[in-house]
Amino acid sequence: MSHLDNGFRSLTLQRFPATDDVNPLQAWEAADEYLLQQLDDTEIRGPVLILNDAFGALSCALAEHKPYSIGDSYISELATRENLRLNGIDESSVKFLDSTADYPQQPGVVLIKVPKTLALLEQQLRALRKVVTSDTRIIAGAKARDIHTSTLELFEKVLGPTTTTLAWKKARLINCTFNEPPLADAPQTVSWKLEGTDWTIHNHANVFSRTGLDIGARFFMQHLPENLEGEIVDLGCGNGVIGLTLLDKNPQAKVVFVDESPMAVASSRLNVETNMPEALDRCEFMINNALSGVEPFRFNAVLCNPPFHQQHALTDNVAWEMFHHARRCLKINGELYIVANRHLDYFHKLKKIFGNCTTIATNNKFVVLKAVKLGRRR
């Protein structure tokens, strides 16, 4: 846990998933402080919109103003709810919207934590363009190293005149005034042909490797299991290309597409609808934090290309949670398959959790591993 003192309220905040690391990562950053310093209770008029509030620092601080928390991360929503509870703040104080929803009209203040991907930022700025006015105060923040010329140009292109502040504690702010500059329409998704298939893959703004198949998934697809039955999970499904391939290779199986990103799950659904509509009755789509709340001993196999970062921070906390959830939800003799960068040494992590691990394939960058849930059902 970490403490954030600001002009609105003193907060105790924790990351989600929680970690027991000796030196845990902090649940807020200097950009959060810097953003809050720009505001005064007396000048906040109209709806307050907060975009990409990773662990709820801004939402908790401004809870008295009933803000809207907007983003593409279910984990961030869970983190914000947990930190509201931790600080004795009514959860209903914050309204949660995903980035594809309609934003509230005529907001008085918009606070944006600059996301990792320009594509998501552009989608969000275009959504804001429909609702902000020239009187809306628009401020974005991030680590100084994460604000580039391209970031500022995007604000200028979509919303209007943009300036940036001096750095403070290695954070920087962007101030923007809306003047409705001319702007061409843009498609909601980016599409590309998947090599070796007849499929066209569609990707919403925040999907990993949006403009083509990432090399880890390409390697994984060469080693996916075939002719399985029962239920298979594509955990952290992204655009669903792994799940699509599983549907094709395992015609007797049902595939459950799971991701914490609403845009990823929407992309997966769209890709099944457009490429294998006949398989829709063998699919389930789930926005979730890994497999939280899913009954144990349910699945025959789980396949996963786990992330090794959370927002801008490098961490294996999310992957570790995915592995534990997979073990809990697998049937006896059910199998977990993962692909990962070799340097992450997931072999020993899986062996610690499952008691076994087998290397299926390896190249100079990636490894495909399999772990089996052994033992009797208790």
UniProtKB/Swiss-Prot annotation:
What's the EC number here?
A: 2.1.1.174
User: Methyltransferase among the record's keywords?
Assistant: yes
Q: What keyword terms does UniProt attach to this protein?
A: Cytoplasm, Methyltransferase, rRNA processing, S-adenosyl-L-methionine, Transferase
Spell out the CDD domains in the cross-references: AdoMet_MTases (cd02440)
Q: Does the keyword Cytoplasm apply?
A: yes
What InterPro entries does the annotation carry? DNA_methylase_N6_adenine_CS (IPR002052), rRNA_m2G-MeTrfase_RlmG (IPR017237), RsmC/RlmG (IPR046977), SAM-dependent_MTases_sf (IPR029063), Small_mtfrase_dom (IPR007848)
Instruction: Kindly state which reaction or reactions the protein catalyses.
Output: guanosine(1835) in 23S rRNA + S-adenosyl-L-methionine = N(2)-methylguanosine(1835) in 23S rRNA + S-adenosyl-L-homocysteine + H(+)
Q: GO molecular function of the protein, one example?
A: nucleic acid binding
Q: Which GO terms describe its cellular component?
A: cytoplasm
**Which positions carry the signal peptide feature in this UniProt record?**
none
Where would you find this protein in the cell?
Cytoplasm
Matching entries from Pfam families are given as: MTS
* Top-level taxon of the source organism: Bacteria
User: What Gene3D superfamilies does this protein's entry cite?
Assistant: Vaccinia Virus protein VP39 (3.40.50.150)
Q: What is its main location?
A: cytoplasm
What's the stated role of this polypeptide? Specifically methylates the guanine in position 1835 (m2G1835) of 23S rRNA.
Cross-referenced PANTHER family, in alphabetical order? RIBOSOMAL RNA LARGE SUBUNIT METHYLTRANSFERASE G, RIBOSOMAL RNA SMALL SUBUNIT METHYLTRANSFERASE C
Into which family does the record put it? Answer: Belongs to the methyltransferase superfamily. RlmG family.
Protein name (database record): Ribosomal RNA large subunit methyltransferase G
Name the lineage. Answer: Bacteria, Pseudomonadati, Pseudomonadota, Gammaproteobacteria, Enterobacterales
Originating gene: rlmG
